[in-house]
């Protein structure tokens, strides 16, 4: 049902005795369109008309006779994704809202397992997925329809040939002349191919018309690569090809062609929500050379954002820092001038500021800041996990040290004490030795295990051991848990400063964050790992470090151990030399100076001393 558009009489206007029949009344739809045209004309001729119309339009409810219907918009967007057998297969689709006040605000998202989706027959119908509220995964804000299929290798080759052809298609006619073909062969870096360019051109030109089109080039590349590879080097980055098969070479070059253009047809690495919304592409796959994009170490000290790898979703996540804060932290922590300021009183200033802020966040007035905080991190705090209702928190600090519902953080291999687990919701770095940590991450000139643990907790086994760093951000769950089962031997409180634990400071050679900050060192004596040092380190704005266990207590891995009051903070666990084998994915990310986003209870590593589990059993209890 609906209103049919009115039909006007098409007769010419001539004299006549009879009156012309009256025109039918315009439909509601036509009246609505007419008003839109008039408004558009008025706005076009009136300065500031848009603002006026917007203001008046939102100031009143719509009248019944003005309602024409609800526009249903269908957006079709195709994205090609490289799927590896043992690689990432969870795709995240994010919906952003953009207006004059807020740019690219995440309003909904969904996640889909591509492996699961590809096993379904979606040729005749699409899969409808629910869009979830970023602040509460239990709330549905909309739906999205997607379809997915495996691209035929021939289609992949043709698509690749089209991209390659565009490099030297100077007149943009979709075809290659002999001179353009010659330039393409030279770009491929194959000396043998250059010597017989004309022969290859004739071989490609199947119909003998003196030009090579896209289909002919695709056929040449496909056939010749099997016999005598034409492409020795990537024409974009110069990397040597042929290490794998031709499909991997094609994927590598396609990613190179796409990078930075904002016109990506294929994704082989990982995008953050922010990067995807801006159309950025960063190469972080096995087909790309990692040196082309610096993560962690360099970007952490020079950029206004930090990239971390989400272990659960296998995605990069962008941790954005306010630009003004970045500038101030660089000035303070990454310059000799800043070092001078630190030595002349900034240490005391930061400490006093943190103490005052801690008191403020424990006052009843601070409760009003909770909604603002949730709005700021609405896509990173899941309120469904919080144990107590939001209205029960009487101060900001009560909310900040909130407890989670039972089962919100399952513990990997709970009955197996040979498996260590993550101690905090955090960004994690693992290192097999102190030398590795200082080479890849910690740039303070005076960092050492002895300095970290203090003179009262000295052990040669620990000093030569391995370490893991858990960095907590303000939006994280701020209670820390026991990573291994054992007996608590001692607690040693070490006074100190309250520098930030942000990578901008950690990566600085001018200050020694971990060995100068206020911290509490506890020793856990275990049968599986020997002695493990658990170091809770305060940071800027951290009012206090509270422990819930005492000396002599036996603790089981996953037990709640303590919490940090308001601010960012860090936990460092030091294991004896060769006592633990960290999980391979954590070590691989750390080797690239890339932090891994983990949750309490995720697997950290396995004891090298008492291996009660077989490798296949270890896989079963892996919690990621």
From Swiss-Prot:
Organism: Oryza sativa subsp. japonica
Localization, UniProt: Vacuole membrane; Endoplasmic reticulum membrane
Protein's job: Catalyzes the formation of phosphatidylethanolamine (PtdEtn) from phosphatidylserine (PtdSer). Plays a central role in phospholipid metabolism and in the interorganelle trafficking of phosphatidylserine.
Protein name per Swiss-Prot or TrEMBL: Phosphatidylserine decarboxylase proenzyme 2
Ligand binding (Ca(2+) 2): 205, 207, 209, 216
Active-site residues (renumbered): 425 (charge relay system), 481 (charge relay system), 569 (charge relay system), 569 (schiff-base intermediate with substrate)
Signal peptide residue numbers: none
Catalytic activities: a 1,2-diacyl-sn-glycero-3-phospho-L-serine + H(+) = a 1,2-diacyl-sn-glycero-3-phosphoethanolamine + CO2
Subunit-structure text: Heterodimer of a large membrane-associated beta subunit and a small pyruvoyl-containing alpha subunit.
